[in-house]
């Protein structure tokens, strides 16, 4: 605790002090509401709605509303659970649009009923976001008892539901579901052709459970709805065979690099160098030469070979940066990503930009084709669309700056209902990993012999299996919980607190489920937590510790560390390493040096800061795309709900004529110098005006403006003729034309937006090259993105008119293959070069903000 905090108290303490009077008001209403009948208590809901309609605010009725929920939950025929004062505090913080940090076992699920009920009274819908379908179903059934008792409707969105079921669930006052389901429904709603096919209402208020997992850990994982691609997969296997033959070099340290530079020696050695800290792998000059020979190309850096570079880079990353049983597993013949934060398998999720295919080639399983992105959004941008959002978690304080800067949410630590009894012991540090694991086994055996349950956390599947082998050699019965044994997760976690249980788990497997102590375990010291390695994030370490000591239970935690662990090896200071070497200690001697604890924490802070910078950097780029998405989806919604789109079509005709005239006739040209043949060809490709001729006698008086006016009038006349043709003189003909306009415009917007997403992604992957030209890549990206967006908008107008002028009504419509939804883990280190679209033009840079672009 800092000097000022000791004097003035920390931020959370001050905020809690402010809300204690509100808690007192809620508690004071308790006796009054206890005397109400079930019917009278239920009637309070309509009373609150009426008061809101007359001008009162949610803050005005909060004490009474929370007291009603508290009383309802406590009744034997509902939950028979009464909110503690600290839970009321958490509920107040969450209503204010903040994050309530509440320790494991403090009843966050019950806390959510308070702000959910209060905000549902406005009738605009409340979304309670959980991390998996099981919790969504459980909580909607369990906590739904309170809401249903009080006359509110409760829905639940689950994977596999059809549109009618989803629409009904979203129409409820309170809707439970996973972050993925909410996000995918938003994307799908922005792809429908008829408004009655939409399922979501406006995004009003979100309560996010495990908010750190959703908004921090998943921040770099975009949701993607994709269609099948058409590229061959052969080159993935060829590139894989090539990189497997390469010889690994090493990165020279600063002294070696300087000496090599002074002696004009080549600084690189080997065919490629791997930088584990930066998570990058690149070819050396020798490696480039081998690639040029292997693939029979003269210059690998030539723009013609950008795609080949992409395949080679992915093959390098797959073979030397991605590791089996750490980053992914092979399950039923498929590559399945392992969540680095939970150790769980993530079926259905794939690395993007071809990295997943490169791993498939590496492991010699079937290589699936790359997919085409139809719609995409990140959780950062999706949840920022809610008018108000809040969160709850056991671990958020270490990421407070990110929550505040990116999401506008501050973190308030809520006191525990009972004092924490868990003892968090000092770290024990060993020189080698082997020495560390021997010490861990000794500690496990000592606890096991007296019957104390032990939960051991490892950072990878490989490490969990190494420890399992050591325990088997010692004859210690134990359970292993990692991505390979995920099916037994609930059962294993449920038994982890029983006497004599030994459980090895990767990271936070089992998060969301409390570990309850078996009979007699409290007397033995409670659950013992052993961390076998510090995670890159202090928050993940805190989550592991938080498995013990729930609701005042006893428990203890300790981390064992070796100087060979990735965190210390990559981010520990050289000064620390030299100090340990000077001590001359053996493998099995623990290092008791206060400086090491500080070094470990500094290493973690360094990584956390680096990861925050990456997420912030990605958001800056994604914000450009987000502004464009807002414009496109806004335009799409206008078309979807538009009764009459004819005015838009008339506007398009004028805009296309004006652009085509300006493109072919410059202001300093005389009418006699105009190339009417080329002009006619360009315009007729869009509006079928035929060959445009200007009579000789009219030439002296002709101007660009007159030509635009004449051709716009002609375009409108031709469109009226098309309307009559489609209408066929029938009363419903105009209605048919308006419906046709709507469908055509939506299809064109969707197609051009898909192409634009692809182009923007390609451009973003290659934009880093601008840094070599001493230009800011982000600024260049914004300029280019604006021009690409304007060009896409023009193409939307042109293609819409092309189709409408030439359309023929047919009775049978071919059904398209439905798109797939997909998660993807972005490979942010890959350098993918922008491809050239056939209709791409040289773009003039204009420093105009995207938000000024209001029309498509």
Which residues are covered by each model-predicted region?
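Conserved P-loop NTPase motor core
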Residues: 1-587, 633-634, 650-651, 655, ...
